[in-house]
Amino acid sequence: LGFILPGFSSTPAADSRHAQMATLSGRRIVDMVWEDLKPSDLLSDVSFDNAVTTVLALSGSSNSVVHLIAMARRAGFTLDLARFDAIARRVPVLANVRPAGKYLMEDFFYAGGLRALVSELGDLIDGSTRNANGKTLAENVGGAKVYNADVIRPRGAPLVESDGLVVLTGNLAPRGAVMKPPAADPTREWLFRVRWE
């Protein structure tokens, strides 16, 4: 969404960069007040689509669906399960992190983090959106490198081709439900089938 300064979004809990992140963020917030740059100035339908795309490429939490929809509605934008589903069908899962993959978020950070992931997504992301630091998303991810291509997969060799999260509808979920197929245990696939025999 553009609220955090570049390079800090997935900083591990024990990393010494937290003090630097707090200092730089505090300074930037004060500058934003002087510039009259409000969080609402950073939000748009495009920024929410970028956020959804990023969550899907991470095979992020199904809770992110609820949170992003709530934030969008609160800010006056339209985001619903149908839009999540449409975006999910075209976004590959590039982050080989748990529970869908084998690495930890700490490994993801040291492999290049969110900047590298967003850069790897290429044209699936609209780089024209503005960030809290006043630069565009494209400017912020320009030059980002992937340091471990098994943790952050290239777009041509994703962990999963698409559907990091899927939206389910039907008589059991008339208003919709969300599932994360890449994290499901394939040996228990039978739990999701209905037998008509």
Language model features with spans:
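Catalytic or ion-coupling anion/metal-binding cores of large enzyme and transporter domains
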Residues: L1-E197
